[in-house]
């Protein structure tokens, strides 16, 4: 029997194209709406919320301490599982970076299976347009790949997770979806990855002043985030032996912690801003930045409140996530 003229993927692609359904935009738009809605509830009316919502939203140092909901507890996994989606992010980002560099080097359109995948995720072949040149894409992909690589290293070989710390399964799943979508968004509107387009040649001479500036800002934020994370790691280590002495959350001092309760979250926002502004013509990257900024801000506010309630001597000049402001 001959195979059907249209395969399942082609039917799906035509459906998405016909109704202008952009799966990437839907994903991150949903993330933004969810974090803003529940984050607002947690910030302003948390005491009136059922324990199931409070328990689902909170984790880590500001995890819910009241009477737990059995069903929500059943849906929790160890916080150390963060390392799983950073392992995925490492593989996925390097794969995309390799495909991008190969396409630019060979000066030919991406393979058909890549184009079809991007058509499905990015709104259909007739709605995907070239908005990003190859040099910008290489810079942005390099940034995100570098960040994924360092976070993989930290979560798998450096970070000390409390054995008692849990996260809701939804947080765990969102980690995978975030990196899955963000990496795809690097290519979805890039020359050579849109049908009928050819990648442009890459050259360091073609780097613009904006790209050079953002590379510098990104590297500084990248390095400072690592330094901030190491301060948190060292709080749980014996300074003489280097062995783990506690799994408690202690008061961090030094570096950007002298200004902020969560400098690592502030720096995450800075790094994503650098990528998103380079990709400014692409709507999906504006959504990704808004998602990251809102998520990190809500988490930082909850963390800041926990520090203030836990440590009487907590410095009054520290802000939650934006130096001197918030």
Curated annotation (Swiss-Prot):
It holds the Pfam family Steroid_dh. It comes from Drosophila melanogaster (Fruit fly). Plays a key role in early steps of protein N-linked glycosylation by being involved in the conversion of polyprenol into dolichol. Acts as a polyprenal reductase that mediates the reduction of polyprenal into dolichal in a NADP-dependent mechanism. Dolichols are required for the synthesis of dolichol-linked monosaccharides and the oligosaccharide precursor used for N-glycosylation. Belongs to the steroid 5-alpha reductase family. Polyprenal reductase subfamily. It catalyses: a di-trans,poly-cis-dolichal + NADP(+) = a di-trans,poly-cis-polyprenal + NADPH + H(+). The chain crosses the membrane at residues 26-46, 84-104, 167-187, 212-232, 256-276. It comes from the Eukaryota. This is Polyprenal reductase. Its main location: endoplasmic reticulum. It is an enzyme of class 1 (oxidoreductase). Changing residue 96 to V: In strain: MEL11, ZBMEL145, ZBMEL131, ZBMEL229 and ZBMEL384. Pathway: Protein modification; protein glycosylation. InterPro entries: 3-oxo-5_a-steroid_4-DH_C (IPR001104), Dfg10/SRD5A3 (IPR039698). One of its GO terms (cellular component) is endoplasmic reticulum membrane. It is found in: Endoplasmic reticulum membrane. It is a multi-pass membrane protein. One of its GO terms (biological process) is dolichol-linked oligosaccharide biosynthetic process.
